[in-house]
């Protein structure tokens, strides 16, 4: 896969990584009531995340469907997306590097989670209550811009807010060395 072609990333790697996270939670749930509760919540998730990659001759849209907690990349969404992520081809290499196999891992770092974000039915309900768009920008090094649209009909709107984060600050957030409030309040 080249930096200019995100197909394998969104069609194969992201769903495979997501499903490995569910597999790991299934193993953790054996004999652990709290891990079982979390797994049950993860398995109740049914929804769609769309990713739109702009640039090139046409924009590409990937439908990442989640059924019973497991993700697949499909030709059509199973539901209206609760989250639409938009980025261009020029920043794909940075996004791929910063997120590893999971774009939600990238977003989880911004929320202060050092590990993989585990989407539960409760978290999904909270996301469904959101309506708006935000632009996330990594600055310094290899810059990157990602727009996240939450809620119906927000994809047509421009971002309602922008977050600019230096790459070194993001690295500290991702490693769990810096709390989000410290990063954002510290400027």
Regions found by a protein language model. Give the residues of each.
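Feature captures hydrophobic
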Residues: 1-186
């Amino acid at each position: 896969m080249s930096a200019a072609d995100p197909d394998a990333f969104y069609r194969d790697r992201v769903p495979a990584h997501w499903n490995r996270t569910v597999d790991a939670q299934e193993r953790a749930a054996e004999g652990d009531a709290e891990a079982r509760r979390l797994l049950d919540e993860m398995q109740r998730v049914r929804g769609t995340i769309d990713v739109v990659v702009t640039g090139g001759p046409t924009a590409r849209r990937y439908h990442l469907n989640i059924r019973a907690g497991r993700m697949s990349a499909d030709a059509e969404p199973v539901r209206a997306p609760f989250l639409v992520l938009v980025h261009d081809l020029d920043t794909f290499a940075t996004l791929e590097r910063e997120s590893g196999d999971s774009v939600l891992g990238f977003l989880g770092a911004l929320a202060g989670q050092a590990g993989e974000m585990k989407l539960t039915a409760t978290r999904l309900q909270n996301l469904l209550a959101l309506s708006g768009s935000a632009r996330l920008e990594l600055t310094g090094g290899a810059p990157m811009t990602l727009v996240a649209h939450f809620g119906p009909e927000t994809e047509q709107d421009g971002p309602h807010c922008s977050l600019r984060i230096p790459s070194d600050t993001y690295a500290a957030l991702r490693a769990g060395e810096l709390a989000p409030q410290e990063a954002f309040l510290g400027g």
